[in-house]
Amino acid sequence: MFLNEKVGAVIVAAGQSRRMGGQDKIFARLSGKPVLAHTLSVFQQSPEIDDIALVVSEHNLKKAKELVKEYNFSKVIAICSGGELRQDSVSSGLTALCDCGWVLIHDGARPLLDPVSIPEGLEAAKLCGSAVAAVPLKDTVKEISPEGLVEKTLPREKLISVQTPQVFRADIIQKAYRRVGITATDDAQLVEKLKLPVKIFSGAYANIKITTPEDLLMAEILLKKGR
């Protein structure tokens, strides 16, 4: 609960794992458990979270149900089939959490989320209805032409790398999904298109997204070091 309203989490785990060398990233083993089990554990154990909607690829529905049962993730109230686009998957999850006043959207392939990010994200979202986790960029970023030539160097001090969770008042993110007809790489982008403010709160460099086998190795190291 947060401000006397139910809090739901959409865990998006319907990606295609194209860069994982043939293994499904959400079921890859990380310190003896599937990546997805690590992710769900953070939300299951969070006192702020009431309900979880898990979104997976259609071919993973059975495995996801078995995982939820095996680890007794009692807060998972729905296991939904994802769509062609990430937005379709999130939309399915939002529908399942229709009685929640606040919603966190998190990548299922980010298993090392610090639990404090959940209350911190909710507090940040309280200010304007939307908030996203982010970290400062470490590398120099350049804009290039279609031919691969550098056009300009972007001011790093004005740029951030956005992560999940992304936290929203439920009515705001539902409105964004209903009204904005664009393809977005994250949920906050849809809210931005409504000309609504989005607050930034501190993410963590350890909150990596498992995309390649190298990411999985790094996650093992971070987990053994306690992040």
Swiss-Prot record:
Keywords: Isoprene biosynthesis, Nucleotidyltransferase, Transferase. It catalyses: 2-C-methyl-D-erythritol 4-phosphate + CTP + H(+) = 4-CDP-2-C-methyl-D-erythritol + diphosphate. GO terms for molecular function: 2-C-methyl-D-erythritol 4-phosphate cytidylyltransferase activity. Gene3D superfamilies: Spore Coat Polysaccharide Biosynthesis Protein SpsA, Chain A (3.90.550.10). It is an enzyme of class 2 (transferase). Belongs to the IspD/TarI cytidylyltransferase family. IspD subfamily. This is 2-C-methyl-D-erythritol 4-phosphate cytidylyltransferase. The lineage of its organism: Bacteria, Bacillati, Chloroflexota, Dehalococcoidia, Dehalococcoidales.
